[in-house]
Amino acid sequence: MKLKLILLGSLSPLIGLLIFFLQLQVPFHGIKYLVILAIMSAVFLAYFFFCAFFFSSKQHKKNSLYFFVTPFILFLVNFIGWIQKYVVLALIVSGVSAPFHYVLPDLIFPGDKYYLIMSIFPLVICWIAFKIGERVGIYFKERI
């Protein structure tokens, strides 16, 4: 179970990058553009929710730790300066943040002193979606 959670967590930056590249294909026009971006971000958060939902149990309290090993390591690697010089490599490393790039514009390449807060914000949002899925999964498994 731990290995499955680590592998599913390792897929999340790749899925985030895929959603980011899909967002680049959306024409930049009006409310339809914003709705499509919101739907794509919601689909990305649904991935975290359903992974937690299907792996939730009262015995395994550390599911989120195993699931977020790879995204957190990539978050730390993102602070290496030379990675930011190469846009594609920086996007791969910040894959969990990528779907939120158009929602929060200064997220991937900010230049201010609050870089850490803005960079960890998407990871926190994904963690909250994971925890909600875990709680809902435990609730439904108790009812059955």
Q: Predicted segment positions?
A:
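Transmembrane alpha-helical insertion/packing segments
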Residues: 1-44
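Alpha-helical transmembrane segments and their helix-start/interface "positive-inside/aromatic belt" motifs
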Residues: 1-7, 60-70
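Membrane-helix interface and helix-disruption motif detector
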Residues: 24-36, 59, 83-89, 107-114
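Canonical alpha-helical transmembrane segments
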Residues: 39-63, 67
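Transmembrane alpha-helical segments in integral membrane proteins
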Residues: 46-52, 118-142
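Hydrophobic alpha-helical membrane-insertion segments
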Residues: 65-88
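Short hydrophobic, aromatic-rich alpha-helical segments embedded in or entering the lipid bilayer
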Residues: 87-105
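Hydrophobic alpha-helical transmembrane segments
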Residues: 103-126
